[in-house]
Structures are given as C-alpha cells and as structure tokens.
Design a protein with these regions (language model features):
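Active-site-adjacent beta-strand anchor residues
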Residues: 21, 53, 61, 132, ...
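Adenosine-nucleotide cofactor-binding segment
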Residues: 154-156, 160-162, 174-191
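NAD(P)H dinucleotide-binding glycine-rich loop of Rossmann-like/cofactor-binding domains
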Residues: 80-156
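Cytochrome P450 core scaffold surrounding the K-helix E-X-X-R motif
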Residues: 30-36, 85
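Conserved hydrophobic/aromatic beta-strand scaffold that supports enzyme active sites
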Residues: 5-9, 57-59, 73, 111-113, ...
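Glycine-rich beta-strand-centered segment in the early N-terminal region that forms part
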Residues: 11-25, 39-83, 123-125
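Glycine-rich Rossmann-fold phosphate-binding loop(s) that bind the pyrophosphate
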Residues: 135, 161-164
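Residues forming the Rossmann-fold NAD(P)(H) cofactor-binding site
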Residues: 167-168
Length: 191
C-alpha cells in the first residue's frame, strides 16, 4: 500500500472555519473498501489518494468565529453542501454538495477545518457514541422522511434489512414511536 502525506497551511486568523483535532472515529464499510482497495479500480483512481473516515468527533483547537471554546467537544458532519436545505431539496441532493471521505479528504487527519455549521457540540455523551452521530443521522433522516410522507395509520412498520443500520433504525424508531410494531426482515435468520 502507498501512504502519502500532505501538508496544508491554514490561516486561522481569516477563517470562518473551526479547527478540530479528531479524538474518536468510526470506520464504516465504505471506508474499509477504500482502504483495502476493494472498490472498482476506476473509482479508486478518481478518488484516491484521500484521507478516509467520515464518522468522527473531536476537540476544538481554534475557533476564529467565537462559536466554541478551545477544548469543547464537537461531532463533525461530513456532508458539505454549498447552501442550506430548503423545503424542496435536502442538502445532500443539492448540486455542488460533496461528502468527506468520498473523493475529498475525510477526518483521518491531525487537524480538521470545518465550517461552523458542519459541527455539533455535545456534552454528557461518551465520545465513542458521539463518533457514531453521522451513522445515527442516516437512520434519523429516514425516520424524518417517514414522519413527513407516511399516511397516519402507523401500527406496523417493516424494515427490509438486518445490518447495523437497520438495527439503529429499528432502535430509534422504537424509541420515538413505542406504540408501533416493528418487523425486521433480512437474510440472516440468527439476527
């Protein structure tokens, strides 16, 4: 495997970004496939070299915006839209949006520079859990869409998957809607 190191100078005096030192990361299957070279060679040639990891939290080391105190903990958001969501399009469907760790350097760096709105402060949550906030947000996005689009009869919900995201989705759905009966169908009978 080839490892490349890239140095980038960041002027923190004229920045609207927060500088963060990652302290906990989670690695997902997509990041594993990049790291292990198990993606299509054409895809790898377009996206590498790149720092992996899109699930992480960290500690603020500098914030010229004054939003955070140095030492404050934040979860980092890998979705980088050119503008905020509106009533028509979610930010991840907007033209110009890109995702860190998918053709753009992810969070496996010594210091990360992110716009303030791509960070979420947290307290009283273990770092190991905060590092999974992006993963959990995928399930919450599905639940928000369900809440907006589903008809009002919600006695039963079927989840067609049995992986880790399906588990998080079922857990969050049960927490938010304890009266709903959830059925999970997958290909692994032991689950």
């Amino acid at each position: 495997k080839n490892i490349s190191i890239k140095f980038e100078e960041i002027d923190i005096n004229n920045s609207s970004n927060v500088l963060i030192k990652p302290n906990y990361m989670a690695i997902c299957h997509a990041d594993q496939r990049y790291y292990q070279g198990k993606r299509d060679p054409k895809v790898l040639s377009k996206k590498l070299p790149m720092a992996p990891i899109h699930e992480a939290c960290g500690i603020v080391v500098a914030d010229p915006t004054g939003t955070y105190e140095v030492g404050q903990k934040v979860a980092m958001i890998p979705n980088q839209p050119p503008c905020a969501s509106d009533e028509v399009f979610f930010e991840n469907y907007r033209p110009g949006t890109y995702f860190l760790s998918s053709g753009h350097d992810g969070f496996m760096q010594e210091t990360i520079s992110l716009p303030v709105d791509r960070t979420v402060p947290y307290d009283n949550i273990p770092d190991e859990i905060a590092a999974l906030s992006e993963f959990t947000s995928v399930a919450m996005h599905a639940i928000n869409r369900f809440d907006r689009l589903a008809h009002p009869i919600r006695e039963d919900v079927l989840i067609l998957a049995d992986g880790s995201l399906a588990f998080v989705l079922a857990s969050a759905l049960h927490y938010l809607y304890p009266e709903i009966r959830i059925t999970v169908v997958g290909r692994n009978p032991e689950k």
